[in-house]
């Protein structure tokens, strides 16, 4: 006689806990085995990336590097160095300032290329603007005629230099510069006696193509100092340090006498301005706004 399986209370037959767990385990194994099997299947070879077109966009640093090397092949009197800075690209990171300090082994307080900051607007509509300010390398530099020993002068290529061996530290040129682009080096050593001495105390600088060891008494200690467009790098066919480290690609450099150079192209834009043009200094640093 067959066993009667109907329950008198009307409920369906129950499922044991062991049977339920076994069924769940089988389902989980099936779910996992699908992706594993797919992953184990041999992948097809990726399609090769298309070749970059030869006439594609050129890296601006490479273009400016070529501009510099082309200019250096000319006599010094036939080139005219200039810089353009796109203020729309500047993010105020001060990478250019730090690169300049590292390149020229500058002590605290001697800054060739600060990034000036300005807050504009009213709360809550406030924004900040940044303006890198190197030496303007003026065509009519007011710092030159005030030097009593002719230690500062304009080279044929437009760079305004300081002859450290002739400078007497009178600082007349610092007062005469309307851009605040010159600072005095008092020869201080700020980390003497500390565990970590700074680079400017232990490593020589190579400004103007010479080696300057810092001892607190000899040049450039006691001299006026300023940006010189990294002339020692230019003479080696390299761009200024501030140009190569700009995060936003906001700084451009080259020969204004070369119509093929990038800086010549940018300086002719309608949105270009120069600082304090009303003074007649004719700065060679152009700002795109």
Name each model feature, range by range.
Residues 12-21, 39, 43-47, 96, ...:
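Twin-arginine (Tat) signal peptide motif
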Residues 49-55, 59-63, 102-131, 153-166, ...:
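Non-heme iron-sulfur electron-transfer modules
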Residues 232-289:
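Long, compositionally biased charged/polar accessory segments in the mid-to-C-terminal portions
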Residues 3-28:
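N-terminal secretory signal peptides and thylakoid transit peptides that target proteins
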Residues 75-98:
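Mature N-terminal segment immediately following signal peptide/propeptide cleavage
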Residues 90-96, 100, 135-138, 143, ...:
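Short cysteine clusters
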Residues 95-101, 105-108, 143, 152, ...:
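Short functional micro-motifs and their immediate structural scaffolds
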Residues 14, 34-83, 278-280, 286-289:
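C-terminal segment of N-terminal export signals and the immediately downstream linker at the start
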